[in-house]
Structure formats: structure tokens, C-alpha cells
């Protein structure tokens, strides 16, 4: 008895093994984060040592809640509510979960797909169907079976898709931290603005009471004939003008309170923040060296991860030029009669590979690849623009803090001088040496300078918050970015090195 020659089957097995071994190949281009040049030090801060280094998001370095540097218990309590109740943060969390789900979706491409089904049908064949022995007859079909298919990742299409999805998920994780930083900074800014209004409100309330007492005294003097009516008119004008400022403070404070309510996730109609007068203590904030900015800013990390995702899309576009290999198998039971349906003679099965490739598509794949390269170039430009904007924001806040410190010192001297002038002018009026108009003028100047001093103090706190935000705040990302941060970095060349 002659046995069938085994060579054809062996050839098929060897060919299949060779194609499967190509799964180690990948069309993904080698990736390294874009390089950016940074100065050795900020223009508004002491110089740092020049040199080269590689910067990656320092996720493992916890810096805590950055707002605690202000030592304000009310602010700390409000900031703690952001993670729990702020709706913008919740949306960013949902976006992150969606990105993570896409990673799982793409990763499923490594695994086979298995389906199962059962079907029963009864049909009648047309009498006029030529060449059919069943013409005019009614037949039944009973079938149950399973099918499996698997597409080996020969050219890395699935790996590239997973890499792109993971990079996008990492970007979403950094986006979440950027949203938190933005919301907490906005909350701190609004809070200090509100506290500044509380201080100014108390100043205006005290001033209104003092002006009212002075007006009462002037009216008594007018009745006694000691002064003329112009002094009373001037005092009344000054009192009502100050009351107008006092009312305006109330409206501005209400708007800030409503904004804070929204940031902490509470209805503005039910939220109230009791007034409290406090002296602002501007903290010392070390800016560090510019290269650290690339390690701290979550928006920079997000931009870099989007560059990586665009790089992975190039790999996916390249993989489309290669054929797809699909291994499929199916088995089941099928019978035209119900009784023998679930018996061994009803068994059927099939097994085999399929290799399919596109020969002509009118240039669609080439266009997709060009688009992927263009998207990569755009993401690189976006990353570098994010870095430039980050340095601009830091320099802006450093300059503002430096200028405001000088302004505060000058304004304090002006406030002290105005207070002294008011005391001297009041004494001269009481001695009959000047008119009450001189007193009104001195009072207005003194009040204006005190309010300006309070406003400068609030602006210094706002600039401090802005600097902390520009420096990345207390960003501490989780394990999502830590994994890639350990294996990739941004090469930085410091100018002048």
C-alpha cells in the first residue's frame, strides 16, 4: 500500500511557521521624545549650573498639595472638595477611563475570537429550480457549532495600535492632572481675591462710620454757626461716595463666592463663605532650574505622549501595506433531521489559513501614511509650543512677583505718608487754619492708598498662585505615566552650554 507523500502538508506547515515567525517584526518607527533647548536659569531667578540632562515627568516625586504653602485652613478645606465634587475634574476622569478602555480594546487584538451558535430552519425548494433533486420538496436543517479565528500580529499592526492607545491613555492621565491643577489654581485665585474684598469691606465699613460721625459733628457745628454749609455738603458727598464703593464691594464678593461654589461642585444658591479679614503672607517659592519645568508640568507630559501616539499611528499606517494572515477553524453538528442531529455522523469541521492583501486602493494607504507623518509633525510642533508657553508663563509670574514686591514697598510708604498727612490736615482744620475741603482731600487720598495697598497684596498672592501653577503645582501622577517615564525622556540642551 502506497502512503500519501507528506511533502505538500510539510510545506504548508513550514510556510505557516515562517509567516508566524514574522510576528516579531514591527513597522513602528523608533521613537524618542522631541528635543528642546532651555535656558540655564530663569531671567527672574538666580542662575543655575549649565549642562545637559534628560527630563522626564518626575511622577514618583510627590510634592503634596501645593496650596498648603499658604497656611490657610479655609483654602485647604475648599481645595479638598475639588477632587470629590468638581464636575470638570469628573469629566476628565471619565475621559481617562475611556482612554484606558481603548487600550483594553486594542490589546484584545492579540487574542483569538471564538463564536458559538445554534440554528434551525425549514424551507421549500422551488419546483422550477433546474438541476435540483430537491425541487418542490420541503427540507429542514439543524446546526450547532463553534468557530474560532486568530490573526497573528505578523507586521506589528496590533502592537502599534496598543502602543498608540497606551500613549493616548497616558496623555489623558496627564490631562487629568492638568485639569486639577487649573481648577485648584483658579479656586485659590478666587479665594484670595475674595479675602482681599473682605479686608477692603471692613476698611470701607469703618470709613463710612467715621465719615458719618464726622458729618454729624459738622452739622452740630453748622447749627452753632461755627462753620459754613459748604463743609457739610462736602462731608455728605464724601460719605455717599464711600457708601457706593462699599456696595460695589458686596456685589464683587458675591460673584467670587458664586465662582468658588461652582469650583467646589455646589450650587451657588446654597453656598456661603463667611467673611474673614486676614493679612496676606506671600510665600517664598523656589522656581528651580528651567529643565525641571519639563518634569513637573502635566500639560508638557500630555503633549509628549501625544507625539508618541502619533508615532504609533505611523506604524499602523505602514502595516496596512502588508497582507493580513487569518487562521480560522470551525466545528459542529449539522443534520437535515432532528433525531440524528446530535450524533457523531452529523459532525463537520474545517481548518485553514487565509492570507489577504490589497493590490490596489487608488493611493488610499499612501495618503493615510502621509497624513500620519503630518500628524506626527503637528504633535511635535504642539509639544514644543507647549514648552515655550510654559517658560513664558513662569517668566511672566516671576516678573510680576518681582515688580509687585517693589510696588508693595512703595505703596506702604505712600500709605504711611497719606495717613500722616490726614492727621496733620485734621489738626489744622480743628485749629481753623484750613477749610474742610482740605480734610476731605486728605481723607480721600488716605483711603485710596490703603485700598491700593490691599489690592497690591492680593495681586501678589494671585501671582504666587500663578507661579505655582506655571511650575506644575504639586503634580503627582500615578502609575499610568510612571511606567513610560522610567524608559523614555526628553533630551534637553541648555543654552550657553
Predicted regions and their residues:
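Terminal intrinsically disordered/low-complexity segments used for targeting and assembly
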Residues: 2-84, 142, 166, 250-295, ...
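Short flexible linkers and secondary-structure junctions
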Residues: 26-187, 325-329, 362-369
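Sec/SRP-type N-terminal targeting helices
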Residues: 91, 107, 152-180, 230, ...
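Outer-membrane beta-barrel pore domains and translocons
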Residues: 117-123, 149, 197, 238, ...
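Outer-membrane beta-barrel translocator domains and adjoining extracellular loop/strand segments
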Residues: 127-133, 234, 274, 322, ...
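Hydrophobic, lipid-facing positions within transmembrane beta-strands of outer-membrane proteins
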Residues: 142-148, 190, 289, 349-355
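Periplasmic alpha-helical coiled-coil/stalk elements that build and connect Gram-negative outer-membrane
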Residues: 158, 167, 173-289, 400, ...
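A short glycine-centered flexible hinge/capping loop motif at secondary-structure junctions
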Residues: 222-226, 429-433, 470-474
Amino acid at each position: 500500500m502506497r502512503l500519501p507523500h507528506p511533502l505538500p502538508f510539510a510545506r504548508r506547515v513550514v510556510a505557516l511557521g515562517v509567516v508566524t515567525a514574522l510576528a516579531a517584526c514591527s513597522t513602528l518607527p523608533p521613537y524618542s521624545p522631541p528635543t528642546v533647548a532651555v535656558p540655564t536659569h530663569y531671567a527672574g531667578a538666580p542662575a543655575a549650573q549649565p549642562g545637559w540632562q534628560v527630563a522626564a515627568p518626575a511622577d514618583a516625586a510627590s510634592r503634596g498639595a501645593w496650596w498648603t504653602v499658604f497656611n490657610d485652613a479655609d483654602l485647604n478645606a475648599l481645595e479638598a472638595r475639588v477632587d470629590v465634587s468638581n464636575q470638570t475634574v469628573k469629566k476628565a476622569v471619565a475621559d481617562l477611563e475611556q482612554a484606558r478602555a481603548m487600550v483594553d480594546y486594542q490589546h484584545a487584538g492579540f487574542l483569538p475570537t471564538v463564536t458559538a451558535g445554534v440554528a434551525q430552519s425549514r424551507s421549500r425548494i422551488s419546483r422550477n429550480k433546474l438541476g435540483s433533486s430537491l425541487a418542490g420538496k420541503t427540507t429542514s436543517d439543524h446546526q450547532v457549532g463553534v468557530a474560532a479565528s486568530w490573526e497573528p500580529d505578523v507586521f506589528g499592526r496590533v502592537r502599534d495600535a496598543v502602543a498608540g492607545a497606551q500613549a493616548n491613555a497616558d496623555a489623558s492621565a496627564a490631562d487629568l492632572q492638568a485639569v486639577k491643577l487649573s481648577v485648584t489654581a483658579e479656586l485659590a485665585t478666587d479665594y484670595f481675591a475674595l479675602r482681599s474684598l473682605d479686608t477692603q469691606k471692613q476698611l470701607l465699613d469703618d470709613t463710612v462710620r467715621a465719615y458719618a460721625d464726622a458729618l454729624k459733628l459738622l452739622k452740630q457745628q453748622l447749627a452753632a454757626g461755627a462753620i459754613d454749609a459748604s463743609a457739610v455738603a462736602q462731608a455728605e458727598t464724601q460719605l455717599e461716595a464711600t457708601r457706593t464703593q462699599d456696595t460695589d464691594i458686596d456685589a464683587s464678593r458675591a460673584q467670587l463666592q458664586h465662582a468658588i461654589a461652582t469650583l467646589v461642585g455646589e450650587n451657588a444658591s446654597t453656598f456661603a463663605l463667611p467673611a474673614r479679614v486676614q493679612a496676606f503672607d506671600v510665600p517664598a517659592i523656589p522656581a528651580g532650574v528651567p529643565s525641571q519645568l519639563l518634569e513637573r508640568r502635566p500639560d508638557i507630559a500630555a503633549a509628549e505622549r501625544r507625539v508618541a501616539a502619533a508615532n504609533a499611528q505611523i506604524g499602523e499606517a505602514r502595516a496596512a501595506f502588508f497582507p493580513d494572515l487569518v487562521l480560522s477553524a470551525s466545528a459542529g453538528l449539522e443534520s437535515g433531521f432532528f433525531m440524528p442531529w446530535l450524533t457523531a455522523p452529523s459532525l463537520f469541521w474545517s481548518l485553514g489559513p487565509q492570507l489577504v492583501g490589497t493590490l490596489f486602493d487608488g493611493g488610499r494607504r499612501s495618503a493615510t501614511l502621509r497624513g500620519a507623518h503630518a500628524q506626527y509633525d503637528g504633535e511635535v510642533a504642539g509639544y514644543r509650543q507647549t514648552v515655550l508657553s510654559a517658560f513664558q508663563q513662569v517668566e511672566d509670574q516671576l516678573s510680576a512677583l518681582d515688580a509687585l514686591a517693589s510696588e508693595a514697598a512703595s505703596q506702604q510708604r505712600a500709605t504711611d505718608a497719606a495717613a500722616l498727612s490726614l492727621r496733620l490736615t485734621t489738626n489744622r482744620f480743628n485749629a481753623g487754619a484750613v477749610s474742610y475741603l482740605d480734610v476731605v482731600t486728605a481723607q480721600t487720598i488716605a483711603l485710596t492708598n490703603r485700598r491700593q495697598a490691599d489690592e497690591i497684596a492680593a495681586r501678589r498672592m494671585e501671582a504666587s498662585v500663578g507661579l505655582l501653577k506655571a511650575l506644575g503645582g504639586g503634580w503627582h501622577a500615578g502609575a499610568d505615566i510612571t511606567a513610560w517615564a522610567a524608559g523614555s525622556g526628553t533630551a534637553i540642551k541648555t543654552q550657553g552650554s
